[in-house]
């Protein structure tokens, strides 16, 4: 449960909330998780608490008054996942952390496909995709790095510097630019 301070100072984009929900769905369908034990609602609650705490730590470290939950904050929910699910033998063999990260990855992929055009494997030479400009941008950049601990202002500045990303977001997910 979010504290009053977290509610006032940390913006949780709807996409981040959807990702938390999708992680629970992925867990319920996972071959690594014991379906007899189920996936408790506590998983979502604990994951949200960890997610907000991660953002809050950054906010305090940077002496800022407001911040936004970032995708990189989702690494902080791994303990919430591993502590709230029971693994079957195959999951135990892979390891709890591996399974938790796999759930997060699968949830990201599912939401990506709901929000953006599917990434097709190119079979036709010269076929265009909505991602061509973005891929070209990254190939042409010698270095691009965003650290999770940087300030909100610097984080937005870095993301907004990727013009093909802005174009893609404007077309398919304009609320992300707000």
Where are these regions (language model features)?
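Conserved AAA+ ATPase small/helical "lid" subdomain
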Residues: 1-68
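C-terminal engagement/docking regions of AAA+ P-loop ATPases
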Residues: 36, 56-178
């Amino acid at each position: 449960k979010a504290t009053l301070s977290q509610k006032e100072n940390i913006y949780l984009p709807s996409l981040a909330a959807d990702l938390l929900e999708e992680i629970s769905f992925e867990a319920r369908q996972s071959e690594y998780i014991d379906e007899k034990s189920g996936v408790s609602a506590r998983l979502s609650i604990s994951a949200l608490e960890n997610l907000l705490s991660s953002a809050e730590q950054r906010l305090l470290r940077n002496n800022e008054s407001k911040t936004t939950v970032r995708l990189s904050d989702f690494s902080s929910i791994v303990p919430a996942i591993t502590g709230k699910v029971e693994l079957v033998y195959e999951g135990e063999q892979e390891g709890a952390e591996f399974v938790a990260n796999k759930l997060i990855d699968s949830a990201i992929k599912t939401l990506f496909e709901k929000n953006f055009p599917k990434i097709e494997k190119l079979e036709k030479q010269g076929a265009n995709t909505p991602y061509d400009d973005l891929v070209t941008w990254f190939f042409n950049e010698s270095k691009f790095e965003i650290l999770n601990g940087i300030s909100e202002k610097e984080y937005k500045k870095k993301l907004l510097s990727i013009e093909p990303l802005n174009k893609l977001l404007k077309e398919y997910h304009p609320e992300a630019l707000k």
